[in-house]
UniProtKB/Swiss-Prot annotation:
<keyword id="KW-1003">Cell membrane</keyword>
<dbReference type="GO" id="GO:0005283">
    <property type="term" value="F:amino acid:sodium symporter activity"/>
</dbReference>
<feature type="topological domain" description="Cytoplasmic">
    <location>
        <begin position="433"/>
        <end position="453"/>
    </location>
</feature>
<feature type="topological domain" description="Cytoplasmic">
    <location>
        <begin position="217"/>
        <end position="220"/>
    </location>
</feature>
<dbReference type="Pfam" id="PF01490">
    <property type="entry name" value="Aa_trans"/>
</dbReference>
<keyword id="KW-0029">Amino-acid transport</keyword>
<feature type="glycosylation site" description="N-linked (GlcNAc...) asparagine">
    <location>
        <position position="260"/>
    </location>
</feature>
<feature type="topological domain" description="Extracellular">
    <location>
        <begin position="1"/>
        <end position="104"/>
    </location>
</feature>
<feature type="transmembrane region" description="Helical">
    <location>
        <begin position="515"/>
        <end position="535"/>
    </location>
</feature>
<keyword id="KW-1133">Transmembrane helix</keyword>
<feature type="topological domain" description="Cytoplasmic">
    <location>
        <begin position="498"/>
        <end position="514"/>
    </location>
</feature>
<keyword id="KW-0812">Transmembrane</keyword>
<dbReference type="GO" id="GO:0003333">
    <property type="term" value="P:amino acid transmembrane transport"/>
</dbReference>
<feature type="transmembrane region" description="Helical">
    <location>
        <begin position="221"/>
        <end position="241"/>
    </location>
</feature>
<keyword id="KW-0597">Phosphoprotein</keyword>
<feature type="glycosylation site" description="N-linked (GlcNAc...) asparagine">
    <location>
        <position position="276"/>
    </location>
</feature>
<feature type="disulfide bond">
    <location>
        <begin position="249"/>
        <end position="321"/>
    </location>
</feature>
Length: 547
């Protein structure tokens, strides 16, 4: 039996349920009688840790079978919040500016708030279903609800979602680590050496850092690394905000051959060269002055100055640097999947819940509320200021867009290092639920084995390395996985498990009507988003896109 299942979850009545008082009173009696019989085994546990998530239906034999698993959680409220926040944050934050560019500011904010609220509601359904269903393992909830098909459905969804998440982290390493190494070595461009090849680098990082961290036995050990990862992401958001006020619009494009910047414009305009105030930067910025000449220069002098500087310039459209509030195009299809992918933490909710100290459903819901709200604020800031920096020129991986502007910039170099460290330390967190799913499916009653523990981690990491090397752009990871498995985990599975396993509420109760509406919304969203993405692939195939 998996150690994450049925570990002393509080069974206080649900305040949200009008039928909360209907929980069997006989449960307390059963719990007390069994507690007396096993008092020596649970001598060091508090009263709550001796209650089992069984709804009073387990007999003495099953209680005895579960006895070894019923030990209290040891992870603090703060560490649990760090772990869940880190699971939410991931690399989705790097794709949000791209989503805003293809939805507009107002539409993006509405969608972001809606997805955050729906994610909170989904966690509420999942936690309540875990209590009523008697398991803290996603696959076993599926098995109790629909038998073997439900177990397989949960397994496939968790595996696809977390493999997509791991792949997106490795994509960041593939794209950003060569740029960091190139900057440290003072190279103006990638020379093609093996140590600047992202495919080689992700293999080295996977074997040297990710695999050893993935061999830890418990998820709680990663609480401190989660806190450090979040600190790195806070630093990332801070620098994105700071750079918004340094990079002018229209976007300066670095000409590596002469060390200057050029604009993508077509008509003459007046520009003034401004030094970049960032330390050790090899870049000069150009500001657009369309209504006056550079100070002290007449028209001919200005033109001569521009000719001598080697700057290429063209006029830009009037609205190129104007923010868009509502945007609808073929890329809008990727916006909602990217947002959904950014808020997925559901495979980690139950493992974190199982390790929460003095756990209760309400306490875990508070952890979820704090984590999702905090990430909502960080997402909004990163998306808004990233979009207002690059507007329509933003890329699907935000940090990669800055390479258009800088050859070397100390704050951005530090940001890239921070993000690389953060995503590298996050990979083991999303690997844990996949390994648990594999063990639950293939080795449900086997004792713990270090060899199996190692081999599953090694195979998963190897498969992700192959995927990252073969898939050309990160957007298709975010879009397709977000539209399929992420919607299963956020919308569909929690709703159907709730409808099936929560017996004490009638089907016409407000709680189940809400879950049914939630299920229908999830189905329509998944079908619609995947259809739009497939249509976009047909008419604008991936090989024709350059990022």
């Amino acid at each position: 039996m998996d150690p994450m299942e049925l570990r002393n979850v509080n069974i206080e009545p649900d305040d949200e349920s009008s039928s909360g008082e209907s929980a069997p009173d006989s449960y307390i009696g059963i719990g007390n009688s069994e507690k007396a019989a096993m008092s020596s085994q649970f001598a060091n546990e508090d009263t709550e840790s001796q209650k089992f998530l069984t709804n009073g239906f387990l007999g003495k034999k099953k209680l005895a079978d579960y006895a070894d698993e019923h030990h209290p959680g040891t992870t603090s409220f703060g560490m649990s919040s760090f772990n869940l926040s880190n699971a939410i944050m991931g690399s989705g934050i790097l794709g949000l500016s791209y989503a805003m560019a293809n939805t507009g500011i107002i539409l993006f904010i509405i969608m972001l708030l809606a997805v955050a609220i729906l994610s909170l509601y989904s966690v509420h359904l999942l936690l309540k279903t875990a209590k009523e269903g008697g398991s803290l393992i996603y696959e076993k909830l599926g098995e109790k609800a629909f038998g073997w098909p439900g177990k397989i459905g949960a397994f496939v969804s968790i595996t696809m979602q977390n493999i997509g998440a791991m792949s997106s982290y490795l994509f960041i390493i593939k794209y950003e680590l060569p740029e960091v190494i190139r900057a440290f070595m003072g190279l103006e461009e990638n020379t093609g050496e093996w140590y600047l090849n992202g495919n080689y680098l992700i293999i080295f990082v996977s074997v040297g850092i990710i695999l050893p961290l993935s061999l830890l036995k418990n998820l709680g050990y990663l609480g401190y690394t989660s806190g450090f990862s979040l600190t790195c992401m806070v630093f990332f958001v801070s620098v994105v905000i700071y750079k918004k006020f340094q990079i002018p619009c229209p976007l300066p494009v670095l000409d590596h051959s002469v060390g200057n910047l050029s604009f993508n414009n077509t008509l003459p305009m007046h520009v003034v060269m401004l030094p970049n105030n960032s330390e050790s930067s090899d870049v000069n910025f150009m500001m657009d002055y369309t209504h006056r000449n550079p100070a002290g220069l007449d028209e001919n002098q200005a033109k001569g100055s521009l000719h001598d500087s080697g700057v290429e310039y063209e006029a830009h459209s009037d609205d190129k640097c104007e923010p868009k509030y509502f945007v609808f195009n073929s890329r809008t299809a990727y916006a909602i999947p990217i947002l959904v992918f950014a808020f997925v933490c559901h495979p980690e909710v139950l493992p974190i819940y199982s390790e929460l100290k003095d756990r209760s459903r309400r306490k875990m819901q508070t952890v979820s509320n704090i984590s999702i709200t905090g990430m909502l604020v960080m997402y909004l800031l990163a998306a808004l200021f990233g979009y207002l920096t690059f507007y329509g020129e933003v890329e699907d991986e935000l940090l990669h867009a800055y390479s258009k502007v800088y050859t070397l910039d100390i704050p951005l170099l530090m940001v890239r290092l921070a993000v690389l460290v953060a995503v590298t330390l996050t990979v083991p967190i999303v690997l844990f639920p996949i390994r648990t799913s594999v063990i639950t499916l293939l080795f449900p009653k086997r004792p713990f084995s270090w060899i199996r523990h190692f081999l599953i981690a090694a195979v998963l990491i190897a498969l992700n390395n192959v995927l990252v090397i073969l898939v050309p752009t990160i957007k298709y990871i975010f879009g397709f996985i977000g539209a399929s498995s992420a919607t299963m985990l956020i919308f569909i599975l929690p709703a159907v498990f709730y409808l099936k396993l929560v017996k004490k509420e009638t089907f016409r109760s407000p709680q189940k009507v809400g879950a049914l509406i939630f299920l229908v919304v999830g189905i329509f969203f998944m079908i619609g988003s995947m259809a739009l993405i497939i249509i976009d692939w047909i008419y604008d195939p991936p090989n024709s896109k350059h990022h």
